[in-house]
Amino acid sequence: MESKIYKMELAGRELSFEIGKYALLANGAVLARYGDTAVLVTACASEKPREGINFFPLTVDYEERLYSVGKIPGGFIKREGKPSEKAILSARLIDRPIRPLFPKDFYHDVSVIATVLSVDPDNPPDVLAMLGSSVALSISDIPFEGPTGSVLVGYVDDKIVINPTAKEREVSKLHLVVSGTKDRVMMIEAGAKEVSEDIMLEAIMRAQEEIKKIVEFIEGIVREVGKPKMEYQKRIVPEDIKQKVREIAYDKVYQYVQIPDKIERDKKLDELKEEVFKAFEGETEETLLLVDDALYSLEKEIVRKMIAEEGKRPDGRKFDEIRPLYAEIGILPRTHGSALFKRGYTQVLTVATLGTKGEMQFLDGLEEEEAKRYMHHYNFPPFSTGESKPVRGPGRREIGHGALAERALEPVIPSEDEFPYTIRLVSEVLTSNGSTSQASVCGSTLALMDAGVPIKAPVAGISIGLITKDDGSFILLTDIQGIEDFFGDMDFKVAGTREGITAIQLDIKIHGLTKEIIEKALYQAREARLKILDFMQTVIDKPRSELSPYAPKIFKTTVDPEKIRDIIGPGGKMINKIIAETNVKIDIEPDGRIFVAAPDDISGNRAISMIEGIGREIEVGQFFLGKVTRTASYGAFVEIYPGKEGLVHISQLDERRLKSVDEVVKVGDLVLVKVIGIDKLGRLSLSRKEALNVTYSRKAK
């Protein structure tokens, strides 16, 4: 094929797709450019279907190349390793809008690989990779019912902005990625600073307008260079198998799916599956796969028909009803904050840990190096679904759900000036029956409040499901459980405060959503969210006023940046002396802010006093927390900061007359003293007696 470049304008910048020049053996390949960002996207499919499976084997990889931003990988091995968390999240962004657009009976392995070649900060490569994947699949011979378009949406100065620049993204109240076909929305991923439902809907529909232009542009490319779609062997269940499965299972499935209790319901359905397979004993593996397909289709048909035509949900709830809620806080005594949140069978334990500034996570990827002081991790162990299998590291799903919960709470996390701690949340899914990510949002809010983190507002999350009918009408289901998620058309996760939305994640199994569905889902989610927030505030209505006694105590001071060198000392001598004497951790910022993490108030105040004393002009009347270094018959010598001592005469040690210095102090004691005199040689006269009634507390709030 002859190389050709197709161009269009998008948000005032040129978007181009170059086809026929790169990756010539791939089924479809395109070099996508937007500004100075360039991503090569390829799509390949196996020649034959994979044997013995009943799922679509699609894999999507997002390959970050550090040369794209002029960097050499750090560490001993100077090449890229396993995908970063950002790369995994980007791969999920590409996957989710395209997966529903492949034929349901297509079992060939399909691989989509997006390789980032050049990055312009104003034009994020992940959204460009989404566009490239749509083009690569659409022009290939792989069966794909696209194309799709994707855009990033911001909300800056009360205006919706399509594909905002890096500066605009910094001040935007919204980070929204929307993907869709010409007339329907396929995927939504959003983080927001308490944005209203009206603004969110407007932003989504504004995105859809741009997506329509992109899709029409790609359709034009496909008409010119698109390959004919490959013929593939369709796996069709014969009517006799369908009929036999129906005769055995219909009445029992209808009865069992209405059992409210998940454990009992799953047990009965598993027994029924064994009964059905027993009726086909001796058949080939291929036939048994068809039997499995027939049983799945029957269960799906019955559950959807029961909801759509009879108005019944499997557990008997109304369409807008939330499962029973339960929550408990402070259940792990040695952690800094903990909460158990339950919604029906779904059960999540979240633990909050407070750390020092030095425990922040440093990210060095395609973007500028970034320090993360708040993070959320989500674990989904096999026992949560009652399965017996090895425990592996976090998969893409865990990373995606953790990022969603992290994004949901980020707008309410206090600033570093308000709360100078690093915050880590870990959500352990103990029992899964749908909507575990949103349960982790609720549990995280409670754990933060239990830990005494002054969050700006509580956050709750809910999942809305969808059942569409043949006539185009639809039913929305609040708080979907596992069986409704499995057989339904949508999982629309919405998290937020009473004021607005903080995060959205939409996954669908059909060919897109209309404006009407999205609008109703947003408002139904809001109604449920407010009910959950009401419940959560009966458990704890505001953050605890005090931190856990096991949390580090953070003290903060600010010094002249020019004094930092003196505080560190030659070869770190001075700062190491402070650390050794007070048993603290010290983090120094270039702007002069100094954070001290201490095991107790005395150590923290002592360290702050020592730091502030270095290079400071001492004046009569100032107070210091010092350490007794030696004693004599006439008084005690007190070091008020490293290298600076003063004498507390025996007459200044106490209000009463003393016979011996040892009656009040001994070497190693910390004492609060006041400077009462400085002689011509700079020697200090100190008084403990005048400082006795002074409360010394410099603990950072």
UniProtKB/Swiss-Prot annotation:
Alphabetical list of SUPFAM superfamilies matching this protein: Eukaryotic type KH-domain (KH-domain type I), Nucleic acid-binding proteins, Polynucleotide phosphorylase/guanosine pentaphosphate synthase (PNPase/GPSI), domain 3, Ribonuclease PH domain 2-like, Ribosomal protein S5 domain 2-like
Cofactors named for this entry: Mg(2+)
Compartments reported by the entry: Cytoplasm
InterPro entries: ExoRNase_PH_dom1, ExoRNase_PH_dom2, ExoRNase_PH_dom2_sf, KH_dom, KH_dom_type_1, KH_dom_type_1_sf, NA-bd_OB-fold, PNPase
Reactions catalysed: RNA(n+1) + phosphate = RNA(n) + a ribonucleoside 5'-diphosphate
CDD domains (UniProt xref): KH-I_PNPase, RNase_PH_PNPase_1, RNase_PH_PNPase_2, S1_PNPase
Pfam family, one: KH_1
UniProt domain S1 motif: residue ranges: 621-689
Protein's UniProt keywords contain tRNA processing: no
Gene Ontology MF annotations: 3'-5'-RNA exonuclease activity; magnesium ion binding; polyribonucleotide nucleotidyltransferase activity; RNA binding
Alphabetized PROSITE patterns for the sequence: KH_TYPE_1, S1
Class of enzymatic activity (EC top level): transferase
Membrane-spanning residues: none
Keywords: Cytoplasm, Magnesium, Metal-binding, Nucleotidyltransferase, RNA-binding, Transferase
EC number: 2.7.7.8
A single cellular component GO annotation: cytosol
Xref: Gene3D superfamilies: GHMP Kinase, N-terminal domain, K Homology domain, type 1, Nucleic acid-binding proteins
An annotated GO BP: RNA processing
Domain KH, residue spans: 552-611
Tree of life domain: Bacteria
Positions bound to Mg(2+): D485, D491
Major site of localization recorded for this protein: cytoplasm
NCBIfam families: polynuc_phos, PRK11824.1
Family: Belongs to the polyribonucleotide nucleotidyltransferase family.
Function as written in the Swiss-Prot or TrEMBL entry: Involved in mRNA degradation. Catalyzes the phosphorolysis of single-stranded polyribonucleotides processively in the 3'- to 5'-direction.
Protein name (database record): Polyribonucleotide nucleotidyltransferase
Protein species of origin: Caldicellulosiruptor bescii (strain ATCC BAA-1888 / DSM 6725 / KCTC 15123 / Z-1320)
